[in-house]
Amino acid sequence: KVENRATGIVMNVKTGEIVAMAVKGDYDPNNPFVIADEEERARIAELPEEEQQEATSAALQAQWRNKAVSDTYYPGSVFKMVTLSMALEENVATEETTFTCTGSYVPVQGERAINCHNTSGHGTQTLVQGTMNSCNPFFIYLGQLLGTETFFDYFEAFGFTQKTGIDLPGESQSIYHDRDMSLMDLAVESFGQ
């Protein structure tokens, strides 16, 4: 159940060392073979007997999984700072760059519109204002100025296409791995989705 879990990592930003890690949606390590989720236990109990063992095994594997290491999540709006740094480094944007946010933006003709969190729009904003407003359409625009090739080159340079190498088992693969990203991929990845 996604709504009943949380994951947190505290990292030494100078060394990358994991200082603390916690996952809520856990189990009792003194009784690791007891399914902690009461609803899941009840659901399994209702299954035909021949299906219960497989369902129990799957539920136990899911609760033992270290979601901080083994699951992959989109970075969300914090990724906008990466897009911003790319745009500034490549000189495709400056502090004077402007973009008019109308509340949504169609990055690729014929595709769906992508909404801003401010559905009435921010109006015309500078680079600083677009960043302060965390405006998704503004960052889509920056991504388009960069283009897919340059954008992916930075993905690789920042190490986003590789595993971190954390000294824990089960690290998942990156969600960013396709150099042949579409223009719609570029649009959503430019603001962290």
Predicted ranges, named:
Residues A6-V78, V82-Q193:
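Beta-lactam-recognizing serine transpeptidase/beta-lactamase-like catalytic domain environment
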Residues V2-N4:
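Short loop/turn motifs at secondary-structure junctions and domain boundaries
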